[in-house]
Amino acid sequence: MLLSWLTVLGAGMVVLHFLQKLLFPYFWDDFWFVLKVVLIIIRLKKYEKRGELVTVLDKFLSHAKRQPRKPFIIYEGDIYTYQDVDKRSSRVAHVFLNHSSLKKGDTVALLMSNEPDFVHVWFGLAKLGCVVAFLNTNIRSNSLLNCIRACGPRALVVGADLLGTVEEILPSLSENISVWGMKDSVPQGVISLKEKLSTSPDEPVPRSHHVVSLLKSTCLYIFTSGTTGLPKAAVISQLQVLRGSAVLWAFGCTAHDIVYITLPLYHSSAAILGISGCVELGATCVLKKKFSASQFWSDCKKYDVTVFQYIGELCRYLCKQSKREGEKDHKVRLAIGNGIRSDVWREFLDRFGNIKVCELYAATESSISFMNYTGRIGAIGRTNLFYKLLSTFDLIKYDFQKDEPMRNEQGWCIHVKKGEPGLLISRVNAKNPFFGYAGPYKHTKDKLLCDVFKKGDVYLNTGDLIVQDQDNFLYFWDRTGDTFRWKGENVATTEVADVIGMLDFIQEANVYGVAISGYEGRAGMASIILKPNTSLDLEKVYEQVVTFLPAYACPRFLRIQEKMEATGTFKLLKHQLVEDGFNPLKISEPLYFMDNLKKSYVLLTRELYDQIMLGEIKL
């Protein structure tokens, strides 16, 4: 009898297992992911209830006591243990305690390249309870001044290699801002932080200076990339840092991992997911001053790297390198980041071995995020019923002509169906606050949508168009500002760029729309960089786009460039290209026009340009 029951039970379990695999193939993946999210929420709730947070800095100090000799940062072959970083950052804190009027809550701007002192200064100021504003090291002159003014700092700390950048704006800085340089010899008007560090004590700083009780407390300002306008100082709260620092853990990283960080530390990916993520785990990071495709794998082998951070272009640059022997001879098991194209993803895995690519979606200023924890190629993440309850987001229809969300006759926004691109919006409430930007409230207000589904509700407009498929995987479609309309259809620039990028002589493709008198919408144009030692095959470009793209999405114009403007995280800038248009009198670089009769692209001459502008050639 017992044997019969056990047989029936066993058979039932097998049937249930196969039914689960058939009907709910991602059940256990979803379950474990949601469980991790719930654990993070429970931890944050405990902090709130207790009225005192355990911040990333607190966790770092705990590691410095428990594992003082463990390497925290490896930089250019030098090892900085948790204890080393603790003592050096305490020296920084004592310099400002003894030689400045900085107090808890004051803002200090930090302009420094990737180096250990970036972390020393950041953590040292955090020990004083200061808010640190990370400045983009690529900006200059008035743009730099605007960023400094936007975050309203009491002090500015500058790396040795960037003092020249600041020297030219010193006369324009407010007298209330003290400028500190990480160099013995500094320009007039700058205080040598390096000199004072040599005599500063490394004693612990009293915790009273940096104790935090509110999750909503501001701890950082991180500037947006500026791809859609001037960079804005996003307010980063303790809540956002604690959430972001858990990403490595959520993807399966442990204290035994060695994380390779090549992205700029002024960016949230490297600072919050990378450095803070290592602190969360008690792990080691290998810090690179600047990403180098040629040195990447040799560094990974040299330092036994097991995890690295990427943005999509980084992986593409690695795939563009000449093939070498032993490319799979490394210990890397995880690649964590965002923006990798499907074709690059496949090529990367095929070429560099069994590395799990962990794609995610997040924005500097947003509280919403998605994680691709199943490894589905091309997806930025996945959602399910339980995650939707924890993270309130929606995908709504977007009007590309009016450049705003569509609304029905009652004035409410409209949900998209699965498989359709929709504007990603996130509910703003006490559970998912939006902290906005420093400076004029208009910057914050412009990101909010009101009365979306009912009177009084408020949503954050991410500006990203996302597609949710039938299996609940999410895919990035385009930015609202990048998508343009032509022939009554919406053209996704990322899709067009991906198709052109498949050609073996194309290194880079940046797609945008240009206005033409007499036509509604914008005609597609692609700026292209060729691979070294290759030539442009215009017939192949034509064949590629007409084969893989609908007629309305095929670029009407090509522009050949040697170099493209990009942000510090390799996002291609389009604004100037759009402004330039396709006028051969204004552009010295080669321009080409799509000729359907010749089934090729042809040189865009002054005569052709005039014919297009006069309407003699129809597009």
UniProtKB/Swiss-Prot annotation:
Which Gene Ontology BP annotations are present?
A: long-chain fatty acid import into cell; long-chain fatty acid metabolic process; long-chain fatty acid transport; very long-chain fatty acid metabolic process
Under SUPFAM superfamilies, the record lists:
Acetyl-CoA synthetase-like
> Chief location of this protein?
membrane
What is the disulfide pattern of this chain? none
Parts of the chain that traverse the membrane: 22-42, 119-139
Q: Which domain of life is it from?
A: Eukaryota
Matches recorded under PROSITE patterns: AMP_BINDING
Q: Where in the cell is it found?
A: Cell membrane, Sarcolemma; Cell membrane
Keywords in alphabetical order, please: Cell membrane, Fatty acid metabolism, Ligase, Lipid metabolism, Lipid transport, Membrane, Nucleotide-binding, Transmembrane, Transmembrane helix, Transport
Any idea which positions bind AMP? Answer: 221-232
Cited InterPro entries: AMP-bd_C, AMP-bd_C_sf, AMP-binding_CS, AMP-dep_synth/lig_dom, ANL_N_sf
What is the recorded membrane topology of this protein?
Multi-pass membrane protein
- Give expression by tissue: Strongly expressed in heart and localizes to cardiac myocytes. Expressed at moderate levels in placenta, testis, and adrenal glands. Expressed at very low levels in kidney, bladder and uterus.
Keyword Nucleotide-binding: yes or no?
yes
GO cellular component terms, A-Z: endoplasmic reticulum membrane; plasma membrane; sarcolemma
What this protein catalyses is: a fatty acid(in) = a fatty acid(out); hexadecanoate(out) = hexadecanoate(in); (9Z)-octadecenoate(out) = (9Z)-octadecenoate(in); (9Z,12Z)-octadecadienoate(out) = (9Z,12Z)-octadecadienoate(in)
Q: Briefly, what is this protein's role?
A: Mediates the import of long-chain fatty acids (LCFA) into the cell by facilitating their transport at the plasma membrane. Also functions as an acyl-CoA ligase catalyzing the ATP-dependent formation of fatty acyl-CoA using LCFA and very-long-chain fatty acids (VLCFA) as substrates. Plays a pivotal role in regulating available LCFA substrates from exogenous sources in tissues undergoing high levels of beta-oxidation such as the heart.
Instruction: Name the family.
Output: Belongs to the ATP-dependent AMP-binding enzyme family.
The protein depicted here goes by the name Long-chain fatty acid transport protein 6
- Designated gene of the protein: SLC27A6
